[in-house]
Amino acid sequence: MAIVYLSLGSNLGDRHSLLSAALEMLQTRVGRLLTLSRFYETEPWGFESPHPFLNAVVALRSELKPQDILHITQAIERELGRTQKSNGGVYHDRPIDIDILLHSVYPKVQSPELELPHPQMWQRDFVRMPLSDVAPWLHPEAPTPNL
């Protein structure tokens, strides 16, 4: 069994309801909820928008491999109204965004569609703040996070 850390964000629609729906779907499809951060309201990162984000980080216990989790999170995003992914560093408003941050069984993943640990998680306050709620022992200077 692995511990998986996921970042969730929403800046369109009923943000609370969308994050809650995503959390329910993740618990049904990915694994058992271990802990959930509080929700943080943050400014958009990497683009300008009048719509602030609501962000959280969740830790789940899962038997799934990172690639399987990625496909599930992408399906959840589509089901909750996301129509396009960020591409080439071009970001936009979205009803839901789910990113895999860390996976305890597969701490290092490098593929065209997924990199673990998430390469930008320590540069983004909207990830760092909620991640510190659920895993305060993690530190950006650690070579491989101790999950």
From Swiss-Prot:
CDD domains associated with the record: HPPK
Swiss-Prot/TrEMBL GO biological process terms: folic acid biosynthetic process; tetrahydrofolate biosynthetic process
Gene source species: Porphyromonas gingivalis (strain ATCC BAA-308 / W83)
Family the UniProt entry places it in: Belongs to the HPPK family.
Pfam family, one: HPPK
GO molecular function terms listed in the Swiss-Prot or TrEMBL record: 2-amino-4-hydroxy-6-hydroxymethyldihydropteridine diphosphokinase activity; ATP binding; kinase activity
Protein name: 2-amino-4-hydroxy-6-hydroxymethyldihydropteridine pyrophosphokinase
Catalytic activity: 6-hydroxymethyl-7,8-dihydropterin + ATP = (7,8-dihydropterin-6-yl)methyl diphosphate + AMP + H(+)
Coiled coil regions, renumbered to chain: none
